[in-house]
Amino acid sequence: MASMDSTPPIDCHRLIVLFFEAIPGVNQIKAAADKLPRPAAVHLAQCDAHSERAAMWTRNPTGRLAIGRLALEYASEALDWETATAFADTLGGEAHWCLGASPIAHPLNTALTFSGTLQLCCFERREGLSDEELKHIWFNEHAPVAVETQNNVGYRQNLVLSSSHSPLDGIVEELFPIAAAASLTDFFADGDDPEKMMNHIQRLTESSERVLDLEKSSVIHMTEQRLL
């Protein structure tokens, strides 16, 4: 199990583009991105035969489940909103401009495809949470629980500031080894201990419900690759 950074500060801005109908090709993405300020990293995730192995984790109470995700990372507010939405429109996606934190750094340091799966969770906050409460609870209190109770090897939080379509509050990106795709015990980082597994599930569920509305959150697994 990966270890969490001692403090998960907001360390970047991310433009998250979600695709619901079709996913653009890599060359199309690169051509469109050439017109933007150069990002520090670009990741593309999409549903395919590989990620389908983790279909048991899919949740779609909202009826809107993304089939692809593009993430561009910037060290500062280098991208204005009008440019961001135009970029997403060109690719046929929805733009979400976010403050980003990385409790567990992304394991792909070069242009490779991750051997496991990316779990993408798009959510609206629990009713009654203010902006500051959402930010504090999610980044400072929930993040350690999410790391302690799951076998995630990458964990990135995206607090949504602006959305071109869906009114999302947060986008979670977690990377899991392929062994966790169809195994409760491998997913919840407990080996073969059923009692510990149930404890992890209970802790994670209770902590998650402090942050998000489970009936307004979707979960899908994708195959992740780094383009830049």
Set out the residue ranges of the language-model regions:
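Macromolecular interaction modules
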Residues: A2-L228
